[in-house]
């Protein structure tokens, strides 16, 4: 009896695996938006299913007329949505019959193709960061503005909110060899963006948001975006991380040197490998390498955070951590 049960179980597993790996239709709206830096405007626009349909259709090389026919959405409505996407610089018109996304559309098969490389790069980057852990701890130890914060919480805020998200991007943009400054969007906004099929985790769970208030740069880091931004007074009341000018300058200097000298060389050394991976994306025919790598790095960073949390080196917030660094004054 037991062999028969095992055989049935195996057959069910094979059948379910086949179903899970079956490709979805060429046109559907089960896609999720992500970006760096975080921009709420872009996310709001792509909450509309038909806007996502348009970008997926353009990714396939289809016209608005064909997308309307396949989706049963009225063509005038799609034209109106395209105008919104074009204004936000998330889509562009090449000519009357050709439009393209201005962000990579990442499909399930792209994820499958890069999964092994992504796991390898995430583990390597985790190991590199851990090998320099004591240097980060030593830099934070003297900060009086951090004295009331438990070590694992402080390390989360700095490592996740200021190194993996923030510091590494600044290092990439300054170096320009693998990822250049984000493309210009609406008005003065500049950000990388992506649309990922099936799984919101693959669009990036962790969100870093930054703004200025009362002479401070305020940073929020956590899963998703908080509904409302936290002000400086609330951070003070909750005895959060607040660094005045001298300590903020010292931390910024450390972060710039650390990311440039300890972490960036790994990416430069393996540049050809990273380029080979992102060139496998179907989106490579219409977006830059930088745009594809922005998504790939976001996935790496999210994976590194999972590894560090599992190792109990950092403590994630119940919702979000919010901290403040004094804006540099004239010297």
Positions of the model-derived regions?
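Extended alpha-helical scaffolding regions
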Residues: 115-217
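Short alpha-helical segments that sit at the start of domains
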Residues: 23-52, 159-160
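Hydrophobic h-region of N-terminal signal peptides that target proteins for export
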Residues: 10-19
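Short amphipathic alpha-helical interface segments
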Residues: 43-69, 199-251, 265
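Charge-dense, extended regions
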Residues: 227, 233-331
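Minor-groove-contacting beta-hairpin "wing" of winged helix-turn-helix DNA-binding domains
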Residues: 97-103
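Short amphipathic alpha-helical interaction segments
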Residues: 72-88, 93
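Short, amphipathic alpha-helical interaction segments positioned at domain boundaries
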Residues: 103-137, 251-254, 258-266, 270, ...
